[in-house]
Design a protein with these regions (language model features):
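Extended, regular secondary-structure scaffolds
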Residues: 111, 116-243
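Short coil/turn segments at secondary-structure boundaries
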Residues: 104-106, 119-122, 268-276, 351-356, ...
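Glycine-centered helix-boundary capping/hinge motifs
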Residues: 97, 346, 451-452
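Surface-exposed loop-to-helix/strand elements on domain peripheries
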Residues: 78-83, 88, 283-285, 307-428, ...
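Extended, charged amphipathic alpha-helical segments
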Residues: 210-369
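Activation/maturation switch segments at domain boundaries
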Residues: 433-483
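Extended, helix-rich architectural segments
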Residues: 1-159, 483
Length: 483
């Protein structure tokens, strides 16, 4: 299968993707935990080369997973200008399992450097070029960097792009669905849809099932949002692609797996062994064949046959050998590498490090309370993530307006990330109370922020509080007259 041929057939230049694909392949291999050029090796034992596979601690996957959990989890809350809009948006997100999808999208995007959330309309009916949106729904999906092909971009990011989806068939052929998001002369987005069949020999044939080849969105809002780590691409300063969160830490990942593999070998090669002479054997009375007096599946024993034991054990039939394991040295080396990795990836040196006595790691709260590097890293990544989420929300609203199903109030878009482990909320709330008392912060803003609701809802809540306060004062006044 050669997607480059498909793109060339459509008049696009795939060179940007082709030149970048070697880095994607490298990061994918480390994300999976097995880089063939590093983890597969040979060692000469004095007789022949023995093929070996190096053990992997799978740290690259762990980095991306942990950062995704810190950035987007169940505590992230999105509110719009009014309560009704917030409910509509939340339903669209819930229908698409967005919380799980976004968390996984961030993990994969941080692994490969780039990812894309794509929005579409599903379940539409087309009758003689008339589109019926009555039963349509907003569809949110994720496309990884291997299937993203930038068409135009500037310093603010990708403006036009093509994405590819594959459906494999049992006969070895594949259905390739190509979508291109292009700006037309009116600077509105047109989505071009094409479907191809690719056979085993990479022959590409366009299928006739390509209704709505050109779909006008009638908006300048892109129906896609790029997700990338907020890290400058130092491999190619002019590339539209982002780089993996561990792109500049490959050598550290190698060092970690070298130590981890050595630790495993140390334990494996240094295990207890019992060497036994032929006197430890007994012979089958029927066949005369030698048999072991101990469990034949026990790999602790090694029979020497006619050889004799050495040194003080030469008159014995069994000699015990115990290797000296260098566990402490390996753990110290591993810990040093993990500290370097934490610093290189923005987690801080203590995040992945462990106590060499208890082998326990610190919690995120403990790490952040002692080191603000992770705090700054999360806040840095949240800048791009918030921008992507706002684009997704605007795209959802664009689809709602196009289909006539809903219109969101985008006068206010609040994205409240889970900062509970990286900020002193009590201190921040205390400061806001002081501002409130000094009339430098409005009650509505205070209620909106700390209740996690829109300003419209906060205004209603403030009025309820005022009404209740007035009612209570009236009761106290009447009670005073009675007394």
């Amino acid at each position: 299968m050669n997607i480059e041929n498909v793109l060339k057939k459509m008049g696009l230049n795939p060179d940007v993707y082709v030149n970048w694909s070697k880095y994607l392949n490298l990061w994918v291999s480390w994300y999976k935990g097995k880089n063939a050029s590093f983890h597969n090796y040979t060692i000469y034992n004095g007789i022949k080369d023995v093929k070996k596979e190096r053990a992997s601690l799978q740290v690259a996957k762990f980095i991306c997973e942990k950062m995704a959990d810190l950035l987007y989890n169940e505590k992230v809350k999105i509110t719009l200008g009014n309560e009704e809009s917030t409910k509509i948006l939340q339903k669209v997100l819930d229908d698409n399992n967005f919380q799980l999808k976004m968390n996984r999208a961030i993990e994969k995007s941080f692994a490969l450097g780039t990812g894309c959330i794509v929005l579409d309309i599903e379940d539409i009916m087309v009758n003689e070029s008339v589109i019926d949106y009555n039963n349509s729904n907003v569809k949110i999906s994720y496309v990884n960097a291997e299937n993203i092909f930038p068409i135009s971009w500037d310093e603010d990011g990708i403006k036009e792009l093509a994405i590819v989806e594959y459906n494999m068939k049992s006969d070895g052929t594949a259905i390739c669905i190509l979508k291109m998001y292009m700006l037309n002369p009116r600077l509105k987005y047109t989505i071009y849809n094409y479907k191809f069949t690719i056979d085993k020999n990479n022959n590409i044939v366009e299928t006739p099932e390509t209704y709505l080849k050109e779909f006008e969105t009638n908006t300048n809002v892109p129906w896609f949002a790029i997700i990338s780590p907020n890290i400058v691409n130092n491999i190619d300063l002019y590339s539209p692609y982002g780089i993996s969160i561990f792109a500049n830490s490959i050598d550290v990942l190698k060092g970690i797996d070298l130590v981890y593999d050595s630790l495993n070998n140390e334990i494996n090669l240094g295990r207890k062994r019992l060497f036994a002479t032929k006197e430890a054997l007994r012979f089958n009375s029927t066949t005369g064949e030698p048999q072991l007096n101990f469990d034949p599946n026990d790999v602790v024993f090694h029979v020497l046959g006619d050889s004799t034991l050495l040194g003080d054990n030469k008159n014995s039939i069994i000699q015990e050998i115990n290797g000296n394991l260098r566990i402490d040295e390996h753990l110290k080396s591993l810990n040093s590498q993990l500290r370097i990795l934490g610093d290189k990836t923005g987690f801080g040196g203590d995040y992945f490090a462990f106590d060499e006595k208890t082998l326990s790691t610190k919690t995120a709260t403990e790490v952040i309370s002692e080191n603000s590097e992770l705090f700054r890293t999360i806040k840095k990544h949240e800048i791009l993530l918030e921008s992507a989420l706002i684009r997704i929300i605007k795209a959802i609203n664009s689809i709602g307006e196009l289909t006539g199903q809903f219109k969101l109030d985008l006068s206010q878009i609040n994205i409240d990330f889970d900062d509970s482990i990286i900020e002193n909320k009590s201190q921040e709330r205390s400061e806001d109370r002081q501002d409130l008392a000094q009339d430098t912060l409005s009650r509505i803003d205070y209620i909106s922020k700390w209740r996690g609701i829109s300003k419209e809802e906060a205004a209603i809540k403030a009025q309820e509080i005022d009404n209740e306060k007035s009612a209570n004062e009236g009761i106290r006044f009447i009670e005073g007259e009675i007394n």
